Amino acid sequence: MELIEKHASFGGWQNVYRHYSQSLKCEMNVGVYLPPKAANEKLPVLYWLSGLTCNEQNFITKSGMQRYAAEHNIIVVAPDTSPRGSHVADADRYDLGQGAGFYLNATQAPWNEHYKMYDYIRNELPDLVMQHFPATTRKSISGHSMGGLGALVLALRNPDEYVSVSAFSPIVSPSQVPWGQQAFAAYLGENKDAWLDYDPVSLISQGQRVAEIMVDQGLSDDFYAEQLRTPNLEKICQEMNIKTLIRYHEGYDHSYYFVSSFIGEHIAYHANKLNMR
């Protein structure tokens, strides 16, 4: 992994690395925050998945998470949201193609050549982190919007791999809303059964489980009713007896002003779980 940015932050280092991804067949950037204690010991890892239009920079520059990661001794890994490059398929819209990988494995041309973000996040990236950084095997996952969707899907499908999961403003029923429907049709085809593998509410209804889900949702979020539908997740978790910590916040929108307001509580939540034995 090639170090391309290095910034001192709260006694640790906010770095950005570039590497070639075998899963995605392109060069990828990834942000890695190494707290002060990483200089002397192995630490657990929180993976952060960003939302539509984002890259590895949004979370590391806008959330203020470094203060809390340093306090709680957690490495934070923030990858890009899709494969990148002139040779990678793209679309002339913000919600499909580069910047909109949806954390799935595409099966349809031309997307299936590079869009294997599920494999990248689940397998390739953790292997690289273990190889190059002072990381323990204990990891958690979180994300925002499309990234919140990805975090929920990865945790629900691999409950033994992630200690805990949380999300900000996640797309909880992508097969039922425009963002998910158009992306799934392009990436996965018209067979809607395939869509359900990447739909958190559907996965829970099929019996997939995690110990607990933490979600924060702003009530002044322009996408709340049409695209996100957090109450769908709350309802299915109640029906399936999955413990939740779902909080609704008056006045907060879909932006990083919202994420930065509560990221400290999410990192504390994950730290508590990651440090349990």
UniProtKB/Swiss-Prot annotation:
Cysteine pairs bridged by disulfides in the record: none
Active-site residues (renumbered): S145, D221, H254
Keywords per UniProt: Hydrolase, Serine esterase
Reaction equation(s) it catalyzes: S-formylglutathione + H2O = formate + glutathione + H(+)
Broad enzyme group: hydrolase
GO cellular component: cytosol
Pfam assignment, any one: Esterase
Record flagged with keyword Oxidoreductase: no
GO biological process, one term: formaldehyde catabolic process
Any GO MF annotation of the entry: carboxylic ester hydrolase activity
Recorded family membership: Belongs to the esterase D family.
Annotated PANTHER family: S-FORMYLGLUTATHIONE HYDROLASE
Function: Serine hydrolase involved in the detoxification of formaldehyde. Hydrolyzes S-formylglutathione to glutathione and formate.
NCBIfam families given in the database record: fghA_ester_D
Protein name (database record): S-formylglutathione hydrolase FrmB
Name of the gene encoding the protein in the UniProt record: frmB
